[in-house]
Amino acid sequence: MYMSTDEVRNAFLKFFESKGHQIVESSSLVPHNDPTLLFTNAGMNQFKDCFLGLEKRAYTRATTAQRCVRAGGKHNDLENVGFTARHHTFFEMLGNFSFGDYFKEDAISFAWEFLTDVLKLPADRLLVTVYETDDEAFDIWNKKVGVPADRIIRIGDKKGGKPYESDNFWQMGDTGPCGPCTEIFYDHGEHIWGGRPGTPEEDGDRFIEIWNNVFMQFNRHADGTMEPLPKPSVDTGMGIERISAIMQGVHSNYEIDVFQALIKAAAEVIGYEDLSNQSLRVIADHIRSCSFLIVDGVMPSNEGRGYVLRRIIRRAVRHGNKLGAQGAFFHKLVGVLADIMGTAGEELKRQQAVVEKVLRIEEENFGRTLERGMAILNEALDNLDGKVLDGETVFKLYDTYGFPADLTNDVAREREFAIDEEGFEKAMEEQRQRAREAGQFGTDYNAAIKVDTQTEFCGYVGTKGSSSVAAMFVEGNEVDSLSAGDKAIIVLGETPFYAESGGQCGDAGEIRTEAGVFRVEDTQKLGNAIAHHGVMAEGVLAKGDEVATIVDAERRAAISLNHSATHLLHAALRQVLGEHVTQKGSLVKAENLRFDFSHLEAVTAAELKEVERLVNAQIRRNHVIETNVMDIESAKKKGAMALFGEKYDDEVRVLSMGDFSTELCGGIHASNTGDIGLFKITSESGIAAGIRRIEAVTGEAALDAIEAQAAKYEEKLAESAQKAKTLEKELQKLKDKMAAAESANIMGKAVEVNGTKVLVAALEGADSKNLRTMVDDIKNQMGSGVVLLANVTDDKVGLIAGVTKDLVGKVKAGDLVKMVAEQVGGKGGGRPDMAQAGGTDVSALPEAIKTVQPWLEERL
């Protein structure tokens, strides 16, 4: 019975839902608050605290289709990806989980029922393994399910290993929850080489593990003793790629529908025909991990998770380059992936444009150095005396050309060389040491503090309260009392002080007794406790003292306004820039707010203006800011946005501002949006690849910012006006010089009328002021004579006449200019020696000028 990968996923979840399991969404590929994990690599990661008894949920049975990545740290499959049938950087793990609910019998029965009744797998193609001493599991398989004893294989501890070191015994660590497991294998047939589990040929590809059921039934102590857990649990995992291969009648995972669609698409965009090429497998695998890492907020960088992403992208690009790819190709596969992933690709579809852009930019950046780096690498390999490339060269390729060591290793391996990994690590460590020496770091006493107290937060309803001192610490050491001047951390049983979370900074204020005052400068979370950081301002304080808690209400109010403004800003950015915008971080203080978000290019001035307008419009609408507590699923149905990387309880606080913004948030907020008063963006910048930052202020600080901006504009305007005046003066000087030069040029056009010099001319491009200057210059040059100059500007005629003083008894400038003006539809007049006129009939000007000489002949 053929089933697509999407159908297998849906069938699995639906089956376990029918068995009373809660379908839980795949958690982020970025583990929440688990520094031991680089990426989510198993279905149980998000339930770790449930198995450890540290967290209780509303359900005791769960099922998931968890997205996983193994490409860095301990679980690093990168170098094998594309070269084996079942190694991937990205895979989906189908799982069902019991938290102190059902145990072995139900888990085994569920697994068998799903495989044989739902998927219709033939029972004679299945065999199972159990831990050597797990008679209970053996009997369930044999007597309850009916699997023949010869198809149930007992697996013991590894030879020479520690007790319980076995493929069929799971342990979280040296101590803690552990237990046996049973694995289900599928027999691909005699035509494929390989032996049954537990035989020397078990690493062959005939018998493939498809499902592992872990039974957590013991608590292992430091001395090695095993204590039965009061409520044993179940953790199972089945790789969707492996079971899909079986359902689609193929042997290699790369032959299933998901990979075949990606391989064909990659071949098409590259222009390559051989679909069996291993480089196409690499590209098909890598587009999955890269796309979903970006969806979950990881961006290419030179450190941590971002560097792993960059390594995978560059490995894919290099394999495309091997196949002859011209230009950027990798990002073109995102749409194909989103479609083929079916129901699991919905979030990728929503963020498709962002994912494509991140990949394209990274690919183009690497493409500029790939050719040069490959040339240097190939030259180094060509000139090698031995078969090992030195670590210094590997480091140079990494440091200068962005070649991750595993990419260099790939190329070297293809040419049957190895790399000096130890030498590379030495060079890397030297670089890290230089970086460490360049920085100065103090002691983090807070990291060493362990507190058993669980502090109750009562600050949603007020800024004052009373409590008792549960614990006090000075420089990381617990103390029983404090005296004036001591810098310390105080833990209370109950507090109105908000601990920094979700970007909102911690409260400040005072903790008082009749005997002393502790000034709280910051408030932080410390496990389940709330830590008040500060200094003993006066008097003394002892453990167990009853205290009054007083939050700085004015500061708290300012912070709450800015926090509410960040919610409006987030919603406005999504409206203006697109729904790909997600919060990547924030800092909310009393003075201002800072908001980091995903966007691949600088926000334009017009976009920032529109964001500001939208936020201020919502402030003016004065929405009531409503807070409702509901279960997480109801919150999601309501459309509440969740913060990237945040972990939420089953019961969450949903903050709504009209129909404009709905978010999950545990912070302190204003009562109405109108309380914010005014919102003003002060800066926008890029802080990392694909991450932008906006800084802003509200209320009086926003007014101050606007006034400061207005003053700055006024200053710039005054500077511009002064510059304009200076330029105008300089321009006039230049025009005067040009007029003087023009005057000298046209003197040659002067004629004599009855022994008197006369100059009549029409000039292009001269303004009236220039004409007057030119008339004066010409009169001075003539000594004795008559001048009439004309110009045309804006379809109007300008006329200026000049007569030297010795001739004003015979000819008056006003009469001359009036005579000409009347012919061009105008009028004018002036002094006997200088007169000005204008007209509107430009076409009549040439004939009017011709009448000047006859008119003068009659008077001179």
Swiss-Prot record:
Organism: Vibrio parahaemolyticus serotype O3:K6 (strain RIMD 2210633)
InterPro entries in the cross-refs: aa-tRNA-synth_II/BPL/LPL (IPR045864), Ala-tRNA-lgiase_IIc (IPR002318), Ala-tRNA-ligase_IIc_anticod-bd (IPR018162), Ala-tRNA-synth_IIc_core (IPR018165), Ala-tRNA-synth_IIc_N (IPR018164), Ala-tRNA_ligase (IPR050058), Ala_tRNA_ligase_euk/bac (IPR023033), DHHA1_dom (IPR003156)
A biological process term (GO) from this entry: alanyl-tRNA aminoacylation
Gene name as annotated: alaS
Functional note: Catalyzes the attachment of alanine to tRNA(Ala) in a two-step reaction: alanine is first activated by ATP to form Ala-AMP and then transferred to the acceptor end of tRNA(Ala). Also edits incorrectly charged Ser-tRNA(Ala) and Gly-tRNA(Ala) via its editing domain.
Protein name listed in UniProt: Alanine--tRNA ligase
Entry cofactors: Zn(2+)
High-level lineage: Bacteria, Pseudomonadati, Pseudomonadota, Gammaproteobacteria, Vibrionales
Top-level EC class as recorded in UniProt: ligase
Catalytic activity as recorded in UniProt: tRNA(Ala) + L-alanine + ATP = L-alanyl-tRNA(Ala) + AMP + diphosphate
Matching Pfam families: DHHA1, tRNA-synt_2c, tRNA_SAD
